Amino acid sequence: MSIKSGFVALAGKPNVGKSTFINVVMGRKVVIVSDKPQTTRNRINCIYTDRDSQIIFVDTPGIHKPLHRLGEYMVKAAVQALKGVDLILFMLDAADGFTKTDEHVAKIVSESGTKTIIAVNKIDVAGEEKAKAVGQLAKSMVENVVSVHYISALKGEGVFEVLEKIKEELPEGPQYYPEDMVTDRPLSFMAAEIIREKIFHLTRQEVPHSTAVVIEEIKDRPNGVLYIRANIYVERDSQKGILIGKNGSMIKKIGTLAREELEFLVGRKVYLDLNVKVKENWREKDFIILQEIGLKDDIK
């Protein structure tokens, strides 16, 4: 039996709701979500399968003006993800209006020559009139637009209409992945992302953006517990102090929340060993950490 299948890249500036959209479609959390911009750093393939389709959503970092080498890698990974896909889902934030960054993303999307669906998110916040103005501006700047939709990813409104349109536009093809597979990323990547999400939720200002999580070891213990050891890198001693907290209170909270989610993910007990280390200016200079968190691999 033939199915509709293919790759769909999500494009947009930071914090427009790309990861929330994917999690709603998947019916579970596959990618981390935060109200802070630039939460997603890597290109992540999320695999949606039903009885007549398989859609590989390529969730990308938001396209923005980079301030350091980490930012450069993130933007290059996002732009590269638009090449060779079957369809682009270009997402915008209705509440923000149509910004200069949106204009920049629209140009990149248009130059790709790929069929594009536009989804204007946060219509529940901005209202229909403002959302439609954003959608029409975006449509006027992008070649090959097949449809424009107005959605609230957070509330799930309009999301499945977009999903049906994606299925309609995809070609008939093979099932690329087993039907029970939801991402092509390994456990080490998922563990690092879960830890990083808790840091984003619990810390403020520059601390979460200055943080890298590197999984050093994952092993099964004889008692059935999964042991995970992770290093959390920051750029300054003051950031290390914030992450550890008074009498270790913050790192304990991060560890507890991450461990609980990891146990749900793997279906058994987890021992999570977190260590905070300082690597000055790692986002600009430390190629080893950039390699470890996967960004250099994403743009080869």
UniProtKB/Swiss-Prot annotation:
Q: Where is this region: G1?
A: 12-19
The membrane topology term of the UniProt record is: Peripheral membrane protein
Please give the chief subcellular localization of this protein: cytoplasm
Q: Where is the Era-type G domain?
A: 4-172
Q: Where is this region: G5?
A: 151-153
Looking up PROSITE patterns in the UniProt record yields: G_ERA, KH_TYPE_2
Q: Which domain of life is it from?
A: Bacteria
The segment annotated G2 runs over: 38-42
Describe its assembly.
Monomer.
Q: What is this protein called?
A: GTPase Era
Q: Which species is listed as the source? A: Thermotoga petrophila (strain ATCC BAA-488 / DSM 13995 / JCM 10881 / RKU-1)
